Amino acid sequence: MKNLCLVLVAITATSLTLNAQNAASDAEAKAAAEATVRSFVDSWNRADGASYGENYWPDAELVNPSGEIVDGRAAIAQEHVDLWAGIFKGSRMAAKVRKVQRLDPNHIIVDFDTELSNVRELPPGNQNQGKNVLRTHLKHVLEKRNGQWKVLSAQNTFIAGK
């Protein structure tokens, strides 16, 4: 009976430890997601290509709302520099995290919505969502390397007008 009690105590202690670790992991995932989205918004609103690109790993991939695949941090940053020189010059971004899902200790999925205001021209494939406004859903897979969270893969999709 004494051995059974010791086993039950050990199982309970292990369970409590795992629950505490999961809670800490979930908090870390949420903090990483929020920090990444804040960095995207800040760098967008400054039209800062280098800072924007730093959110991505060098081997990252982005699928833009038009379905084009952009490979690598440098190409992703340059695509945004080009956008800020064109139809998104002077635009302002606001964003809200909708969902954070931890896949494993080093990978999370972040779903968030953006709204761009002061858009000069709506891109092809986008429905009118109001005067000079563009809304998108983004899904980013963040990967943790050497203690840093950055985007490994991203999908950006226009929100259909209502």
Segments from the language model and where they lie:
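Sec/Tat signal peptide C-region and signal peptidase I cleavage site
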Residues: L16-A20
